[in-house]
C-alpha cells in the first residue's frame, strides 16, 4: 500500500508543524490562561471534578509544570498550557519553585508549601526512576503484543528498522513492532508515557514507514491534535489509551500518584477494549480500501 506522507523534517517541534499545516485551534491562548487561572482559584473547577476525589489536589497545592500540562490535555495541547503558565507567572499570579530538576508552580500568595513540594518530589522520583519507567514501558509493549496475537495479527519483526529486503539507515531508530494481517503490514510504535511522543521521533518513524512501505500505527497514551492530523494525512492511525498503564504490584504507587497529583494512571492486564475495537475497525477500512 503506497503512502502519501507529509513529513516536515526541517521542523523539530510540533508547535512549528502546527503552524506549517495551518491547523486552526478551537481555543485562544487567552482562554487557556483564564482556565488555568481558574484552576488555581476555584475548588469547583472542572479539572477537580472527574474521577475519584483527590483532596490533596486543590487550588492551594503546588503543581509540577508537566503535571499541569497533562491535567489540561483533554482541552488544550501541552505547549499551550505551558505558555499559559508562563503568562500567569509574568502577571505575578503564579510563581515558580525549582527543587532539584523539578519545576513547580503555585499561587504567589501562598506561604506554606515546602512540605507539599517535597512530598511531590518523592512521588516524581519514584515514578520517574529507571526501574519503574522500564517496567511501565515493557509492560505496555507486552499488552500490545498480546492484543495483536489475540486478534490474529502476526508479529513479523520486533525492535526493527528493516522489512522485505529494505533497511532504514537515515537515523539510528527502530520500530517497536512490524505486524501483519491479511497481507497488510503495519509499523507499530508504543508510547506509555505522560509526555507526548517527541516530534522528531514521530516524524522520523513516519518517514521510516513510508520507506519500508508499511502503514504507520502508533499506540500512544495520548497525543496532540497535530499528531492525529499528521497521521491521518499519512493514511495511518493513532490509538489513544489515555491512562498510563502500570503492571500489577504497582497499585500503591498508582494510588499515590492519583491522590496527590491527579495524573491519569492505572493498573491493567490488557489493553482497553476501545483500543482493540478501533484497531479492528481501522484494519477493516484498510482491507476495503476506504
Which functions belong to the PLM regions below?
Residues 170-188:
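Active-site beta-strand-loop-beta-strand hairpin of nuclease catalytic cores
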Residues 222-290:
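Domain-level recognition of nuclease-like catalytic cores that cleave nucleotide substrates
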Residues 206-214:
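Arginine/glycine-rich "motif VI" loop of SF2 helicases in the C-terminal RecA-like domain
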Residues 115-171:
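Acidic-basic catalytic patches of nuclease active cores, encompassing PD-(D/E)XK
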Residues 189, 215-219:
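Short catalytic-loop micro-motif centered on adjacent basic/acidic residues
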Residues 187-204, 226:
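Active-site-adjacent loop/helix micro-motif of nuclease/hydrolase catalytic cores
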Residues 1-128, 285-290:
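Nuclease-adjacent, charged terminal/linker segments that flank catalytic cores
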Residues 155, 216, 238-239:
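Hydrophobic beta-strand scaffold residues
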Amino acid at each position: 500500500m503506497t503512502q502519501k506522507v507529509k513529513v516536515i523534517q526541517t521542523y523539530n517541534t510540533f508547535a512549528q508543524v502546527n503552524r506549517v499545516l495551518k491547523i486552526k485551534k478551537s481555543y485562544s491562548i487567552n482562554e487557556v490562561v483564564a482556565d488555568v487561572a481558574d484552576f488555581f482559584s476555584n475548588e469547583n473547577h472542572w479539572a477537580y471534578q472527574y474521577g475519584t476525589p483527590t483532596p490533596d489536589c486543590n487550588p492551594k497545592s503546588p503543581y509540577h509544570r508537566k503535571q499541569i500540562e497533562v491535567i489540561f490535555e483533554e482541552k488544550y495541547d501541552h505547549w499551550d498550557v505551558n505558555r499559559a503558565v508562563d503568562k500567569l507567572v509574568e502577571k505575578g499570579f503564579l510563581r515558580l519553585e525549582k527543587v532539584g530538576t523539578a519545576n513547580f508552580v503555585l499561587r504567589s500568595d501562598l506561604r506554606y508549601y515546602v512540605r507539599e513540594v517535597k512530598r511531590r518530589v518523592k512521588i516524581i522520583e519514584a515514578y520517574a526512576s529507571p526501574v519503574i519507567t522500564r517496567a511501565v514501558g515493557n509492560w505496555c509493549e507486552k499488552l500490545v503484543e498480546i492484543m495483536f496475537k489475540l486478534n490474529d495479527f502476526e508479529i513479523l519483526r520486533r525492535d526493527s528498522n528493516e522489512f522485505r529486503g529494505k533497511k532504514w539507515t537515515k537515523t539510528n531508530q527502530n520500530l517497536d513492532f512490524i505486524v501483519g494481517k491479511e497481507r497488510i503490514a503495519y509499523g507499530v510504535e508504543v508510547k506509555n508515557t505522560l509526555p507526548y511522543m517527541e516530534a522528531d521521533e514521530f516524524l522520523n518513524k513516519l518517514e521510516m514507514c513510508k520507506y519500508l512501505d508499511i502503514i504507520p500505527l502508533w499506540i500512544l497514551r495520548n497525543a496532540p491534535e497535530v499528531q492525529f492530523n499528521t497521521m491521518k494525512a499519512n493514511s495511518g492511525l493513532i490509538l489513544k489509551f489515555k491512562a498510563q498503564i502500570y503492571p500489577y504490584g504497582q497499585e500503591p504507587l498508582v494510588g499515590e500518584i492519583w491522590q496527590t497529583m491527579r495524573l491519569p494512571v492505572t493498573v491493567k492486564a490488557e489493553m482497553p477494549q476501545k483500543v482493540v475495537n478501533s484497531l479492528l475497525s481501522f484494519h477493516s477500512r484498510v482491507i476495503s480500501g476506504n
